[in-house]
Amino acid sequence: MHVSTLLVAVLLPLALSKPTPRKKTGSFKVHLARRGETEYSRDGPTDLQRAYAKYGIPTTHEMDGYHPQHISKLPGNSKATAGSGKEGVESQDEKGEVVNNPTNHDIQFLSPVTIGGQPFIMNFDTGSSDTWVMNTQMTDEEAKKDHHLYDPSKSKTASKLVDQTFDIKYGDKTHASGPVYSDVMDIGGATVRNQAIGLPSKVAASLAEDKTSDGLVGLAMTKLNTIRPVKQKTFFENLAEDLDEPVFTAQLRHGKMGSYEFGTIDKSKYHGDLIKVPVINENGFWEIPCSLYSVGKLDKIQTIQNGTGTAILDTGTTLLVLDEKIVKAYYAQVPGARYDPTRFAGWVYPCNSPMPSLFLAVGTDHMAIIPSSLLTFQSYGPGPDGVETCYGGLQSNNAGGIQILGDVFFKALFVVFDQRGPSISLAPHA
């Protein structure tokens, strides 16, 4: 087997109703945004639970009744400053770009969106195909608190899609469901006039409690769309014909501003050459072959056996969730690492332990490297023995049959999503 790697300047982060757009768009960029500090904050085990629920992966019994632990900042990281003004949405610059930062600890990368002239901060999710927003029609008053709420009665362009409903379920715990409206949706100055938008009448508590985000913009394929009886296209699919190229790119960087860009591939955002990988789109995901791995260095590439040989690129998941064989092989090389079934229901280790990098197949001919610096998710402070405990950004898929390349993966690589094929392309961040 021949597996190529690509060396770059910083040594390897890649080695081996008909919607009508307003006008010809060409290309546009959306810089990531953040909300101000809120009382709600995620933690590693909670994010792992959400990933399991989203893809229907069975949880371990230790996760039942789990409550978030105290969260500390990552060792050596300064705490992000709180947003100011209206929930951290800053004014546009001379190019019409909205500029701000990701949320605390890179936990969630968010973007400004306007629906019917009303502003929101939303999560771009390549792992789903529904766009939905918190709204005034929700029946739970508690769920409305600390969110921007879309009010269709205040939009001159809103119309209800008669008899259309959506019901997106993330496993059996997290969900959003309700009627569907059509309205003008604007992202970064690019507009779709009749975008289908779900208005949940109820949402799962875990979604309502996430005060950083007002909803989701689904960017997977239409096949995953849950609107019935007629599936609706995503914002990207509606806009694709009016773009210079039917692509969007994700530049999600650790501790820095990033962006999504539609219609063009900015060569200044990455090093070296892009590696193109065909997408397995039969299930509606941005899914690629991913069955090879190596820990520390490329001297011994191993293959997943009796597991899942593909992985889904999902900007809506924070962690890197891989086959249990990979996870065990990785943490076997981290001194003091252990699976903690009681306090964390996941892999933890002393924060001062040296960490190896992880090589992971992207397609059948190339390996990507996830640097060790990106594989610590967060610190929980000193334990009973006085040793600071860290939660890993790499966690097991619990033999769930699905591997998820979440934001830990994206922080290592610049990624192009291309409708042609479809395909994805990857290179190290510039």
Swiss-Prot record:
UniProt-listed GO biological process terms: proteolysis
Sequence ranges of Basic and acidic residues compositional bias: 87-97
Keywords: Aspartyl protease, Glycoprotein, Hydrolase, Protease, Secreted, Signal, Virulence, Zymogen
EC assignment: 3.4.23.-
Annotated segments matching region Disordered: 66-105
Matches recorded under InterPro entries: Aspartic_peptidase_A1 (IPR001461), Aspartic_peptidase_AS (IPR001969), Aspergillopepsin-like_cat_dom (IPR034163), PEPTIDASE_A1 (IPR033121), Peptidase_aspartic_dom_sf (IPR021109)
Origin: domain of life: Eukaryota
Subcellular location: Secreted
Residue numbers covered by the propeptide annotation in the UniProt entry: 18-87
GO molecular function per UniProt: aspartic-type endopeptidase activity
Annotated catalytic residues: D125, D314
Positions annotated with a glycan in the UniProt record: N306
Keyword Hydrolase assigned: yes
GO CC, one annotated term: extracellular region
Residues covered by the Peptidase A1 domain: 109-427
A Pfam cross-reference name: Asp
Signal peptide: 1-17
Record's keyword annotation contains Hydrolase: yes
Family per record: Belongs to the peptidase A1 family.
Function of the protein: Probable secreted aspartic-type endopeptidase which contributes to virulence.
PANTHER family in the cross-refs: ASPARTIC ENDOPEPTIDASE, PUTATIVE (AFU_ORTHOLOGUE AFUA_2G15950)-RELATED (PTHR47966:SF23), BETA-SITE APP-CLEAVING ENZYME, ISOFORM A-RELATED (PTHR47966)
Protein's name according to its UniProt entry: Probable aspartic-type endopeptidase ARB_07403
Native species: Arthroderma benhamiae (strain ATCC MYA-4681 / CBS 112371) (Trichophyton mentagrophytes)
Biological classification of the source: Eukaryota, Fungi, Dikarya, Ascomycota, Pezizomycotina
